[in-house]
């Protein structure tokens, strides 16, 4: 039917949620409008909603691990501010996102911190699936309330120094070396942070949102985005 109508379409992988079982496929006409954002490859048959699409990590760094260094970063809270102040690329920073995750029983919850490279964007669907909870069970945490329990400090949170908190680490960070991360202390960051030596994640998985131009997870060609 799609072909007879002259439509450009793909069989698209879609996410079914943490409780939904296996991945689903749906036929979508590619256009500039539509309910879903779709990542697709013109060099192979890969097509998936951006919520579902796997992200190809950068190659592991071959740098030697440098000594951990605590540095003053007065008032520098965003990735852009920190990167500019320390004169490093955003890809050499670690971004922290803080969440409150509700349990099955009323009033039950835990805190979680997700960490991705500073130049990447968090894919909320991947995070929710990694936590194994319904979508409505996850919300951004109040920084002050979470800080009182876990040691997180708004704008200066990193994976080192947190406690009573589930740490979810994007898989790409495990192969990157000498990154900048918050020191869990106001106005301070750490330089030369390395996974394994300085911190570990309770969950390590792909947390990244795919963008136009990123590598196709099947063939490696640049992906494109459309609606459908």
Regions found by a protein language model. Name each.
Residues 1-228:
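Extended, low-hydrophobicity, polar/charged segments
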